[in-house]
C-alpha cells in the first residue's frame, strides 16, 4: 500500500494533513520529526510532508529532520515551518517577520505541479511569525501574498515544494486540490486506503490479543464502534461497561441502555456513578482539573469493576486522533491544548494494558466504519459529545442547577434544529452556561439570571470548525424558548468564533 509520511514538527494541524490525504484513499502516517533515516526508509514513502510548528528555524533548539532525507529522491512538501526548513536547508534565509494569522490572498505566479488548476488567486490560511527573506538558488517563487513574497516555492526539478500557508485547513480555498496535486500527481500514489480494509485489518490484529477486554462505553459513536470492532474480533471475551456519571444529555442514559440491550449483541453492564462524580467535582472550577477528576473517577470505577468481575487483560477506549493531538500525546513538540479524559498512560496500579483500535482515525472515518458495522442510524446522526460530558460545557463549578439548565437548553437547541431540518446538516450544537449573570425583566420586575451560550458549528472532522450561520428567525425562536422555559435564564447569546482560534467546546 502506497504511503505518504508526514513529519510532525508540532503543529496542531499535523494530523489534519494526514486526514486530508486519506480523503484521497491514500494512506498517510504521522511520525516524529526526528525519525531516523533507517526507520523512514522502512516505511517506503511515496512522498514526505513536513508539517508546520511553533518553532523558528534559527533557534538553537529548533526541531530539524535528518538532513539526509533530502537525498532520498522522494518528493517533499514543506508546510509553514516545514517550508522554512526547506528554505534554510537549501541555503536560503529565514527572518523574523510581522506575525500573520488568518486569511490572505495567495496570487499564483507559476502554475507548478502542486498549483495546477488552482486559478489565478485563492484565499490561504496563514499562521506564522517568520518568513523567507531569500529563497535558495535552485528554487523559484510560484506564489505570493501581500505580506509574503515567497509564500509558495518549488525547486526547478519540481520535486521539492514549500508553502507558507496551510492547505490542510478548510479556511484555505482549494487547499485540498493543492494537497491532491502533490499526492496524486507529484508522488503518483495509488488510491487503495479504505475503511473496509481498515476493519478487516483491525479485526485480524485484535483477534490476536490475549485474555478478556473491558471496554468503557459512553453511548457515543467512538466507544460504540470501538466496542463493536473488538466484539467482531474476540466475541464474548469483551465486556462493555457504561458509567452514568451524571454529566450526560437529557434522557441519554435511558437511550444508551435501550440501544445496547435491544440493538447490539454485546455483554453490557450499567453502573450508577452520579453521586461519586458530582461529589468529586464539587468546588472544582479549573477546566483542566475537571477533566482530570472525570478521568480519575472513570479509572477508579473501572478498577473496582475489573477486580470484582475480572480478570481483564485490556481496557479498551474510543480514543481518536483529535483527542491525541489536543492532549499533546503525539510524538511531535505540540503544545497541550487540553487534556482528554481517555488519553495517556493509565496508572501502574490499574494493571491493565490499553487497547485503542480507533486511535489513528478521525470522526468521519469512524462514522464510515459505523455504517460498515451496521450501527443504528440514530447513533450515526447524533452529534459528538465530549468525554467529560457537561462538565466541560459548564464554566466554573459543576452544580445540579447548571446541569439542569444546560440539559434543557441543549435539548431545545436540538429540537429546533430538527424542526428546521438542520440538525443533520451541522456538526455539533449545544448550550453552555457559566457563573456570569445578567439582568432581565419578568413581568414588571427586574431579576438576575444565568446567561446561556449557544454553540453551533460546521466541521468535517473536528480539527477545524466554523460557526454556523443560522437564519435569524431560528436563533430568535431558540432564544425565546430558552428564556420562557427555563426560569433561571435571562440572556441567550450565540457564539460566532471559529476553530481556530477557539475550540469547539468552551473548556
Residue positions per predicted region:
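RNA-binding accessory domains that recognize and position tRNA/RNA substrates
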Residues: 1-50, 54-60, 64-65, 70-72, ...
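Conserved helicase ATPase motor motifs in RecA-like P-loop NTPase domains
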Residues: 76-82
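Active-site regions of oxyanion-processing enzymes, predominantly non-cytosolic
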Residues: 316
